[in-house]
C-alpha cells in the first residue's frame, strides 16, 4: 500500500476521525487518510476491520515522521548522546517477550491487550506534545486524536476488555505537570524520546496485528 501524505493532517482529518464514534446507523465514516471510495464506493469491497486498523496506524506513523522532522530541524536532539540519561526518567510503553506480540511466543489475545494498554499509556505523553510544535501544531493534534480513534477500533477487536489497564487520571495529571516543569533541554529531549518510542511501539503493533 502507498504511504500517506502528511498534508492529509488538519482540522478536516480530526472531524473525519471522530466520526467513528457516531452510531452504527450512520454511513460508514472515512478514516483520516482514507479515500471515500475505499469505504462506500458502489460495487467495491469495503475495507475489513483489520485493513482499516492497518491503514490508520500507517497514517499516524506518517504524522509522527513529520513531527520528528521538525524536532530534528530545530535542535540537535536526534543526534544527542545524552538521550539514554533522559530516557531513564520516562516510563514509555515498550513491547516485551511476555506481551505475546513477537513472532516467538505470539499470543493474539495477550498481544492485543498490550497494544491497547500501551496506547492508553501513551495518551498522557501525546498530550504533552501539544503546544510543543510551531509549524506542525495541527499535526500534533491529529496524531493525538487519531490515536484515540485507533484505541476505539482495537477495543472492538479485543475479546478480553477487562484485562486492559487504564491509567489513573490523577497519575497522568501529576506526570504531565512534572514533564512541563522540566528545563528547555529536557523538554526538547522528552519530545524526541516520546516520538521515537511511539513510532517503535506502533511499528511493533503493526507487525503483530498483521498476524491476527
From Swiss-Prot:
Q: Which UniProt keywords apply?
A: Acute phase, Cytokine, Disulfide bond, Glycoprotein, Growth factor, Secreted, Signal
- What are its GO biological-process terms? acute-phase response; glucose homeostasis; hepatocyte proliferation; interleukin-6-mediated signaling pathway; liver regeneration; positive regulation of multicellular organismal process; positive regulation of receptor signaling pathway via JAK-STAT; positive regulation of receptor signaling pathway via STAT
Cystine bridges = 72-78, 101-111
Q: Which residues form the signal peptide?
A: 1-29
Q: Does the keyword Glycoprotein apply?
A: yes
One Gene Ontology term of the molecular function aspect = growth factor activity
UniProt cross-references to SMART domains, sorted A to Z: IL6
**Localization per Swiss-Prot or TrEMBL:** Secreted
PROSITE patterns from the UniProt entry: INTERLEUKIN_6
Q: Which GO terms describe its cellular component?
A: extracellular space; interleukin-6 receptor complex
First-listed, main subcellular location of the protein, grouped into a coarse class: secreted
Which residues are noted as glycosylation sites?
A: 73, 172
* Superkingdom of the organism of origin: Eukaryota
Subunit comment: Component of a hexamer of two molecules each of IL6, IL6R and IL6ST; first binds to IL6R to associate with the signaling subunit IL6ST. Interacts with IL6R (via the N-terminal ectodomain); this interaction may be affected by IL6R-binding with SORL1, hence decreasing IL6 cis signaling. Interacts with SORL1 (via the N-terminal ectodomain); this interaction leads to IL6 internalization and lysosomal degradation. May form a trimeric complex with the soluble SORL1 ectodomain and soluble IL6R receptor; this interaction might stabilize circulating IL6, hence promoting IL6 trans signaling.
User: What family does the database annotate?
Assistant: Belongs to the IL-6 superfamily.
Q: What does this protein do?
A: Cytokine with a wide variety of biological functions in immunity, tissue regeneration, and metabolism. Binds to IL6R, then the complex associates to the signaling subunit IL6ST/gp130 to trigger the intracellular IL6-signaling pathway. The interaction with the membrane-bound IL6R and IL6ST stimulates 'classic signaling', whereas the binding of IL6 and soluble IL6R to IL6ST stimulates 'trans-signaling'. Alternatively, 'cluster signaling' occurs when membrane-bound IL6:IL6R complexes on transmitter cells activate IL6ST receptors on neighboring receiver cells.
Q: What is this protein called?
A: Interleukin-6
Gene name, please? IL6
